[in-house]
């Protein structure tokens, strides 16, 4: 029986477009000069309050690194946590554009108490109660981590990528990894392979080998669970297009905003912790001091939830 997964449906749609001489939105490329001024709004704000202020179909990508029910949070029990998560998941689905995606970071509570909330709980809920598609489960594999004596030392974290519809945006070319020269030369001689695809590089797969930030990392701004910019960059480049809006309502360290500025996207970043504003400003300083931003790229920083609309005015549906 033929595999009728949404992945194959997407390939068939892409091939049909190419035969007719058309291009899918994920094949378009915009230079920095075409993006114009991007806008970046931030505030200290609860996730549900943030989402309530946003219109339907208004953002392209949501980066989501939620707190988990691991005895460190203020939920009374597992059902309280899941009930809370269901509310922001439903709102996230509402605000995503038809081509949009949400990338949810999380871990598995291997030896936690029965019923502890983790990414499995969220995936299970989404598969049973949402129309969104589980496009990929990404394994972030890192070499550095805690040692262990009673179990195999953990060296990975999961990222669940859900797409709102089968029309989701995905720009593989933006995140391809180059082949080494020896492999590239061998592949170019293989008549079964497309030379253009070989030239572009390999699909990075859903296993991403990237180090976590250590205590001495220059990226660190003080947040205890800060994610490396490289991980966020790959998500932003692959799942959003230049000029679109990236939302992060558990923004923590503020790294999503920094990456959005670098990549020519608009952003809305909020967090319930008052210290978030301090982290956000550190990210901006890091960006400017280290020359990570294209000098030709223009961006504006706006504080306050009342200004969310400023980051949405460019629109988000790739066409």
UniProtKB/Swiss-Prot annotation:
SUPFAM superfamilies: S-adenosyl-L-methionine-dependent methyltransferases. It catalyses: a 2'-deoxyadenosine in DNA + S-adenosyl-L-methionine = an N(6)-methyl-2'-deoxyadenosine in DNA + S-adenosyl-L-homocysteine + H(+). Residues 1-10 have a biased composition (Basic residues). This is Type II methyltransferase M.RsrI. Its EC number is 2.1.1.72. Pfam families: N6_N4_Mtase (PF01555). The keyword Zinc does not apply. It is an enzyme of class 2 (transferase). One of its GO terms (molecular function) is site-specific DNA-methyltransferase (adenine-specific) activity. Coiled coil: none annotated. The keyword Coiled coil does not apply. Strongly inhibited by N-ethylmaleimide, inactivated by MgCl(2) or MgSO(4). The gene is rsrIM. Keywords: DNA-binding, Methyltransferase, Restriction system, S-adenosyl-L-methionine, Transferase. InterPro entries: DNA_methylase_N4/N6, DNA_methylase_N6_adenine_CS, N4/N6-MTase_EcoPI_Mod-like, SAM-dependent_MTases_sf. Belongs to the N(4)/N(6)-methyltransferase family. Optimum pH is 7.5. GO terms for biological process: DNA restriction-modification system; methylation. It comes from the Bacteria. Residues 1-32 are annotated as: Disordered. Optimum temperature is 37 degrees Celsius. It has about 60% activity at 30 degrees Celsius, the optimal growth temperature for this bacteria.
